[in-house]
């Protein structure tokens, strides 16, 4: 396919975004070693788009040389309020020096979203995804993969009749961090956090929903305006511990262990699945990370070198059981290495580079239904167990460097490289690796113009 080929309509497809942020921060020094602060942030955003995504999930390119012009669209209005109250300070217990942060956070996010109906039909055009019969071509839902035939857009787009969603996410948390210095060479970092999280999604049926329309064999099961609400409430505790050893002033070696949680519905406001009836009562997914690393400042502390090895284990992931239900039984694992360089090699030459290696594995994907189906349905351990985790590249690297030729003139160049990533758990579909090159030149005319 030639570079620059576009399968949508340039006079139809669009994206509009708005973002308004207001921040108020108050800070008061209670003593020389004790500070109380409060930061409140209000964010109002809008994301309104409709674009075309060429989709060949049905193999049309090989069947008839066409591609399905699937539509992605969203109209989302999001209001977010966050408030953080923190008490930071220093104190000593005998010979131990403490630097602590005690705080509480509250956040509330509400999103109202819908999507566009195309030609009064549906939101994506999925009934044309096989690019047959011929009306899928004439109506514009399919087009030639090599020479897309796109005249002016003559159809209609409207949110009338589309389903509407209201997503509310609320979180209250309390945390405590303490960095304890035993000596200039040894430092212990401790952290504890409690979260109370709730997610609620209310879906209002639109007139174009298939459950409202029914078909020749299935009568309608809902009416336009009907509402379905699902909710998940969970609370969880996470913690971290890290030990730092500084053999010299400009170098350190550390080991750390940390946990985190991914509750149901945490991504609902992003337009993804978020929360569904099948998972609304499940527990949060749990993540454990083990890491050993080192950091060094060299060349008179102008250049920072870092290296780390780590393991991340994600348990309690949502997977299908041998009874066909969804439960917290899955597990994935990633072993990795990170190397980094950042800073100045000389006064005029700066560099930022990094390399990451990730060995990922689907340890337990639950169960899958045996195909062809049996009656009653029977399940077997997931055949994808042992595969590379989708959307995780084994190798990735970045490089950016600049050189100041003269006080006013600087040149820069760099590259970003990414290994192939699999698009499905079966590791049968993938996006190939790539390298992207960048370059720049900057000239400072004066302190106000460059």
Residue ranges of each PLM-predicted region?
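Outer-membrane beta-barrel and related beta-rich outer-membrane complex signature
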Residues: 1-7, 42, 46-57, 66-68, ...
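Acidic/polar loop-and-plug regions of large Gram-negative outer-membrane beta-barrel proteins
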Residues: 1-29, 44-78, 123-171, 316-317
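Conserved C-terminal beta-signal and adjacent last beta-strands/turns
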Residues: 76, 88, 100, 290, ...
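Transmembrane beta-barrel architecture of outer-membrane proteins
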Residues: 17-21, 78-86, 169-175, 187, ...
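Gram-negative outer-membrane beta-barrel transporters
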Residues: 302, 308-313, 328-425
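Structural signature of Gram-negative outer-membrane beta-barrels, strongest in the C-terminal barrel
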Residues: 78, 97-99, 105-109, 165-314, ...
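Residues on the lipid-exposed face of transmembrane beta-strands in outer-membrane beta-barrel proteins
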Residues: 22-28, 83-89, 174-180, 241-245, ...
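Membrane-embedded beta-barrel scaffold of Gram-negative outer-membrane proteins
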Residues: 25, 29, 35-41, 45-51, ...
